[in-house]
């Protein structure tokens, strides 16, 4: 399968380029960076410190996507919306690991997914998506009257959005388990005199510092007992592995908007 890596000079872009090079079933056909990037025109090897690969870095989507079967996209929300439209026009699989979308941007991607196959997930890690499945089941079994839910996440100091996309994925899983909308029960940013915790809310605590790739814990706190589900990302390569797995899965599926839960057959 021939793939283009979008956001190639970012942390995840570099991981994806390396991951593609280590696979026999995937060929890196192009890389795309932001317009007027200083990397434009150079061999992609400059991004991963390897021998020349014969692939030129470009900021032109038409050029990058011309010989591809799919796109793997860890960029910015506005850019991912544009790439989804390109993918729909050309019939390319689109794997989206970008986070921080607005409701309007999500709606635009959903429209593009009527014309091509898109897998969009706040976290491409196989472990995190299995964790989300556990959280949903636990939330269903442990009712709001008996157990409070708190989600704690920590990321590196350069992360610009909070709560993290993964924390929201886990929050949505918990909310689905209790048949409520996360936006109606979410609680974050506690400070000063807050009063007692409101029953049924799902709390978020967001920590930032150092080079932490991603730590997430979901705590079910009841009377005299506490259950904690947690996941710690040791390397970004786990996200690249999941994204490539999603691309290979998506090439055999009909048009539509899917998530990693679909890829892992956890949505049933």
UniProtKB/Swiss-Prot annotation:
Any one GO CC term of the record: cytosol
Q: Which GO terms describe its biological process?
A: diaminopimelate biosynthetic process; lysine biosynthetic process via diaminopimelate
The main location class comes to cytoplasm
The entry's function note states: Catalyzes the conversion of 4-hydroxy-tetrahydrodipicolinate (HTPA) to tetrahydrodipicolinate.
Catalytic residues (positions): 155, 159
| Binding of NADP(+), residues | 34
By its UniProt entry, which PROSITE patterns does this protein fall under?
DAPB
Q: Which UniProt keywords apply?
A: Amino-acid biosynthesis, Cytoplasm, Diaminopimelate biosynthesis, Lysine biosynthesis, NAD, NADP, Oxidoreductase
Q: Which organism is it from?
A: Bartonella bacilliformis (strain ATCC 35685 / KC583 / Herrer 020/F12,63)
Q: Which HAMAP family match?
A: DapB (MF_00102)
Where in or outside the cell it occurs: the entry states: Cytoplasm
Protein name per its UniProtKB record: 4-hydroxy-tetrahydrodipicolinate reductase
This entry's Enzyme Commission designation comes to 1.17.1.8
Associated pathway: Amino-acid biosynthesis; L-lysine biosynthesis via DAP pathway; (S)-tetrahydrodipicolinate from L-aspartate: step 4/4
Annotated residues that bind NAD(+) are located at: 7-12, 97-99, 121-124
Q: Which domain of life is it from?
A: Bacteria
């Amino acid at each position: 399968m021939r793939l283009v890596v979008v956001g190639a000079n970012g942390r995840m872009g570099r991981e994806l380029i390396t991951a593609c090079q280590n696979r026999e079933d995937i060929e890196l056909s192009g890389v795309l960076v932001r317009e007027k990037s200083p990397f434009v025109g150079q061999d992609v090897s400059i991004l991963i410190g390897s021998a020349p690969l014969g692939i030129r870095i470009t900021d032109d989507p038409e050029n990058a996507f011309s010989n591809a079967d799919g796109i793997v996209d860890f960029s910015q929300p506005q850019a991912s919306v544009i790439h989804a439209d390109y993918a729909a026009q050309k019939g390319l699989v689109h794997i989206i690991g970008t986070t921080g979308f607005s409701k309007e941007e999500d709606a635009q991607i959903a429209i593009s997914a009527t014309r091509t196959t898109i897998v969009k997930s706040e976290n491409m890690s196989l472990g995190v998506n299995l964790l989300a499945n556990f959280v949903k089941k636990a939330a269903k079994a442990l009712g709001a009257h008996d157990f409070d839910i708190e989600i704690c996440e920590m990321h590196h100091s350069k992360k610009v959005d909070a709560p993290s996309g993964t924390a929201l994925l886990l929050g949505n899983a918990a909310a689905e388990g209790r048949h409520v909308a996360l936006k109606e029960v979410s609680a974050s940013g506690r400070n000063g005199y807050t009063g007692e915790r409101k029953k049924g809310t799902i709390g978020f605590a967001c920590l930032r510092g150092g080079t932490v790739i991603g730590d997430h814990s979901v705590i079910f706190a009841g009377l005299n007992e506490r259950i904690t589900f947690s996941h710690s990302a040791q390397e970004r390569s786990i996200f690249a592995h999941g994204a490539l797995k999603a691309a290979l899965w998506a090439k055999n599926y009909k048009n539509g908007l899917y998530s990693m839960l679909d890829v892992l057959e956890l949505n049933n």
